[in-house]
């Protein structure tokens, strides 16, 4: 079996700023609720997802605290949690990361978020220009990695000064929890090549993803390193292509042109992220040309910052598109879909069999080789068994 034939590592997403069935509308919306997050995490844990991404930002719940809570209600699920250089010291983040890895029994993944919104960064007390934020992050991780791998850290840097920093308790994972990172600028790619274990890209067309992978591999090779690759995508998978595209249209059916224009203006003014600019360039704020590559739909990015594209289609169609990314070197997918509880089930039931991922964990046999038929029954909602092959 070649590496391109191996099943992809699939993570799901916890929508900590809220969820819903329509973009840009309060109709059928769901507030940010810890109980709901727990439902999604427990479903992902059962359904074959290896982990969940917990987002970060002013509109989101704090990711380390939420991950610690969800770890208590799950068994195997890993948690991809944001570490924000500059928001706290390397020593403090080392203690957070080590403790969370210990209490979750080695289920922590770390997502480096340098930041792309000048307004949000200013609120966190960070005023460095775009490229300097990566210089700062490089010094940050010199101390962080030293602490978490050896228990000691010292640096007299331009941005970070640590004298006699110590970490008393090591993480479970050796030498440390894996570091993930996504950044499309040249500065971001150079930073990733020297620090991270897995480079993440948002869901751009395969040709653009291929260009990024070539750049990251070349930059990593200069540092004597190898980096693996993941992609962040939404999914709209239905039994037929026609059903999937109908639901894609439905997702943005309550969006007004004014809402789209307002969102795009905010994204353009608030962000200096190269990745965000690349997402916006796929659709240019227009809703009439949203299929930017076969089955790659940019409708979500009309009003959502960050990951703005979805793979749309039947299980066979979407599986074929995923194999195209896999052939480029992608081995990990961070997935989501609206609403996230229902779509976690739908993706595992429809797509996972097509891409070789095991289904629900701890599945109990319903009968001795009989087909399941759901019927009303005298007690309501019972399962009748019909024999057959």
From Swiss-Prot:
<dbReference type="Pfam" id="PF00296">
    <property type="entry name" value="Bac_luciferase"/>
</dbReference>
<protein>
    <recommendedName>
        <fullName>Alkanesulfonate monooxygenase</fullName>
        <ecNumber>1.14.14.5</ecNumber>
    </recommendedName>
</protein>
<keyword id="KW-0288">FMN</keyword>
<dbReference type="GO" id="GO:0008726">
    <property type="term" value="F:alkanesulfonate monooxygenase activity"/>
</dbReference>
<comment type="similarity">
    <text>Belongs to the SsuD family.</text>
</comment>
<comment type="function">
    <text>Catalyzes the desulfonation of aliphatic sulfonates.</text>
</comment>
<keyword id="KW-0285">Flavoprotein</keyword>
<dbReference type="InterPro" id="IPR050172">
    <property type="entry name" value="SsuD_RutA_monooxygenase"/>
</dbReference>
<keyword id="KW-0560">Oxidoreductase</keyword>
<dbReference type="GO" id="GO:0046306">
    <property type="term" value="P:alkanesulfonate catabolic process"/>
</dbReference>
<keyword id="KW-0503">Monooxygenase</keyword>
<dbReference type="InterPro" id="IPR011251">
    <property type="entry name" value="Luciferase-like_dom"/>
</dbReference>
<dbReference type="InterPro" id="IPR019911">
    <property type="entry name" value="Alkanesulphonate_mOase_FMN-dep"/>
</dbReference>
<dbReference type="InterPro" id="IPR036661">
    <property type="entry name" value="Luciferase-like_sf"/>
</dbReference>
């Amino acid at each position: 079996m070649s590496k391109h034939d191996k099943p992809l590592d699939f993570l799901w997403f916890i929508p900590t700023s809220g969820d819903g069935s329509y973009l840009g509308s309060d109709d059928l919306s769901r507030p940010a609720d810890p109980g709901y997050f727990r439902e999604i995490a427990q479903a992902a844990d059962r359904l074959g997802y290896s982990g969940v991404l917990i987002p970060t930002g002013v509109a989101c719940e704090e990711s380390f605290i939420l991950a610690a809570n969800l770890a208590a209600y799950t068994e195997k699920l890993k948690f991809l949690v944001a570490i924000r250089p500059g928001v706290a010291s390397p020593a403090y983040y080392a203690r957070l990361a080590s403790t969370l890895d210990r209490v979750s029994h080695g289920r922590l993944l770390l997502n480096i978020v340098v930041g792309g919104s000048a307004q949000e960064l200013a609120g966190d007390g960070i005023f460095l220009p775009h490229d300097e934020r990566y210089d700062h992050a490089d010094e940050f991780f010199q101390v962080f990695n030293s602490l978490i791998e050896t228990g000691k850290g010292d640096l007299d840097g331009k941005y970070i000064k640590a004298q006699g920093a110590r970490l008393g308790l090591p993480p479970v994972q050796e030498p440390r929890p894996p570091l993930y990172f996504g950044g499309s600028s040249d500065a971001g790619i150079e930073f990733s090549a020297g620090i991270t274990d897995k480079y993440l890209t948002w869901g751009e067309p395969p040709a653009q993803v291929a260009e990024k992978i070539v750049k990251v591999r070349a930059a990593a090779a200069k540092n004597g390193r190898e980096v693996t690759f993941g992609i962040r995508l939404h999914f709209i998978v239905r039994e037929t292509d026609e059903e999937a595209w109908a639901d894609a249209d439905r997702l943005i059916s309550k969006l007004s042109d004014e809402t789209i224009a307002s969102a795009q203006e905010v994204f353009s003014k608030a962000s200096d992220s190269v990745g965000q600019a690349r997402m916006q360039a796929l659709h240019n704020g227009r809703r009439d040309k949203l299929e930017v590559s076969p089955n790659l739909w940019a409708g979500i990015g009309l009003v959502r910052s960050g990951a703005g594209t979805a793979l749309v289609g039947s299980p066979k169609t979407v599986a074929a598109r995923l194999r195209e990314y896999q052939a480029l070197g992608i081995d990990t997918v961070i997935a989501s879909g609206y609403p996230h509880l229902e779509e976690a089930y739908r993706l595992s039931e429809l797509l996972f069999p097509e891409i070789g991922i095991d289904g629900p964990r701890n599945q109990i046999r319903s009968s001795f080789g009989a087909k399941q038929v759901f019927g009303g029954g005298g007690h309501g909602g019972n399962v009748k068994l019909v024999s057959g092959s």
